[in-house]
Amino acid sequence: MLRLDPRDDRGSILPLIAGFGALALAVVLLGSAATSLYLERTRLFTLADGAALAAAESFDLSTVRPTPEGVLRPRLTKPEVTAAAADYLTQAPGSRLEGLRLVSATTPDGLSARVTLASVWAPPVVSIFVPEGIPLQVTATSRSVFD
């Protein structure tokens, strides 16, 4: 039987350390990118939610009419909803997102406002791999209640 001499250990663990270091760095960068993407989407959704709420409350009091059951219901129009959403976005403190735009602001039933916003997300560290960024789009709906 052939036995290896224990004093004949040659080699280096440097490639192993470099490989694990690169793997750890990749995990950290991917984790920070995923967190950044989540926070950017949350900011965009918060803006869309606020714009939808402002648009849902943009009705004129002269348009409020009682239903046959005696409940007061406001009537929203598309121009009012669009103007209120755009006005909210110009005044909102978090509206400095890159490439923020109002895609649509509509009222599907005359009682609720639906706002769709779009933005562009760029990774915080490795943006060289995605120079144009990644497009994000969110939609929020808010209903006006007149009680």
Language-model-detected regions and their locations in the chain:
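Alpha-helical assembly-interface signal, strongest on the long, hydrophobic N-terminal helix that forms
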Residues: 1-81
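Low-complexity, S/T/G/P-rich flexible repeat/linker segments used as non-globular hinges
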Residues: 123-147
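Short amphipathic secondary-structure patches
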Residues: 54-116
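Short secondary-structure transition/capping segments
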Residues: 6-13, 101-107, 141-147
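Generic short beta-strand segments
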Residues: 117-123
